[in-house]
């Protein structure tokens, strides 16, 4: 009886390990960094009321079976009137192992979940770069990657519907 329980517990542990192994962070790293302050030092004499523009983009590269690199590109541009105070670009990347799952779930994981994990690293890097440029602190607000991904999926679906009649013609 005790041997039977040990066997069942071992099988259950193995099944749980397989289920838990569907997602694994292999590495998070900074792929590229750029900080420019083209109008320094004159920009430091101006009143600091910048317009901040934030651009976010993601890309995914398949490295091998079920292993993907996700790159989150964040660009922050601060302008005072017509002058650029600073331009900060960060590519934060991660290598993720994603086990077997439906394509829709995998797309959501790569397009939303992974960028959401990378964003705090990119935000910290940008904050540090802006600080080293001796500009006032810049604290980027959280980003809703689920909403961004949902908009992307909806746009793709609309494009597919719009292109379908052209293919039939």
UniProtKB/Swiss-Prot annotation:
Gene3D superfamilies with a match to the protein in the record: SecB-like (3.10.420.10)
GO CC, alphabetical: cytoplasm
Short name of one Pfam family: SecB
Keywords: Chaperone, Cytoplasm, Protein transport, Translocation, Transport
Domain of life: Bacteria
MF terms (GO), sorted A to Z: unfolded protein binding
Family: Belongs to the SecB family.
Function text: One of the proteins required for the normal export of preproteins out of the cell cytoplasm. It is a molecular chaperone that binds to a subset of precursor proteins, maintaining them in a translocation-competent state. It also specifically binds to its receptor SecA.
UniProt subunit comment: Homotetramer, a dimer of dimers. One homotetramer interacts with 1 SecA dimer.
Name used for this protein in its record: Protein-export protein SecB
């Amino acid at each position: 009886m005790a041997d039977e329980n040990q066997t069942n517990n071992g099988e259950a542990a193995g099944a749980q390990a397989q289920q838990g192994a569907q997602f694994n962070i292999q590495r998070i790293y900074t792929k590229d960094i750029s900080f420019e302050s083209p109008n320094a030092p004159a920009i430091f004499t101006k009143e600091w009321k910048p317009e901040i523009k934030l651009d976010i983009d993601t890309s995914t590269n398949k490295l091998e079976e079920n292993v993907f690199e996700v790159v989150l590109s964040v660009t922050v541009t601060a302008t005072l009137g017509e002058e650029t105070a600073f331009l900060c670009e960060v590519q934060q990347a991660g290598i993720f192992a994603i086990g077997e799952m439906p394509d829709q779930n995998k797309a959501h994981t790569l397009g939303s979940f992974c960028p959401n994990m990378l964003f705090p690293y990119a935000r910290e890097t940008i904050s540090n770069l802006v600080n080293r440029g001796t500009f006032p602190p810049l604290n980027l607000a959280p980003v809703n990657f689920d909403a961004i991904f949902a908009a992307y999926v909806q746009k793709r679906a609309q494009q597919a519907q719009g292109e379908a009649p052209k293919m039939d013609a």
